Amino acid sequence: MTLYDNWADIYDIVYSYVRDDIQFYVERAQQCEGPVLELGCGTGRVTIPVAAAGCEIVGIDNSVAMLDMAKQKAANAGVQPVLELGDMRDFALDRQFSLVIIPFRSFLGLMAVEDQIAALDRIKCHLAPGGKLIFSAFVPELHRLGDDEDSTYHLRDLTDPQTGSRSVLSQQTAVDSYNQVIAVRLSLEQLDFKGEVVRKSYHEYEMRYAYRYELDHLLARCGFEVVDLYGSFDSEEFGPESGEMIWVAKVL
């Protein structure tokens, strides 16, 4: 069982606000001449729109429950992406891809440098000649990370589109600046029609944040050349005010 197995049934509700990257990945998939591989595909948030756009896509995730949800959603959408259980650090597929994507900061879930290198090595082996890797990471802002440390704050109110049930999502973070690790604890309170809490669930995970030139060096060390670095999913050039790093790289 992985961290996300117990979170699969509410993952899409919790992260329903994350939509600004979908069209970006769909367009990049349409532009490439060949199949697409998504690592950390989860419930198919990006996989299914890419497949619906007519692109051949394979999705890999290490959570059985998340993949089951993705398969159900794909069937409902009338698309047939290939969805497989696997780990981005050691996956081995008997084929190559024109594009490999790692959306929504999933690369930051690799907590050790050795894991990052292993994943990039696997990606390099699965990229066809001229193929590209695209992944995203947030820009670490130390003053903001410090403000959030050990505090609990309200993120958003949620409504299940199928049942109409309401929930309140809160987040607590702890920052280890020495190891560049953020520990996140999400709390989901599900409410009845009176607004009283009837169920409370938690989800904890860690991310190892990384800086621009740290990732630049990591890619170079692993045999990649940076083609583009965007600061938003509108393909704006990365700059001082950017909150995202969207990396586009190819094998040297």
Describe each PLM feature range.
Residues 117-129:
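A short glycine-rich, Lys/Arg-flanked "PGG" loop and its adjoining helix->strand segment in the class I
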Residues 98-114:
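A short SAM/SAH-binding and catalytic strip from SAM-dependent methyltransferases
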Residues 134-216:
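SAM-dependent methyltransferase
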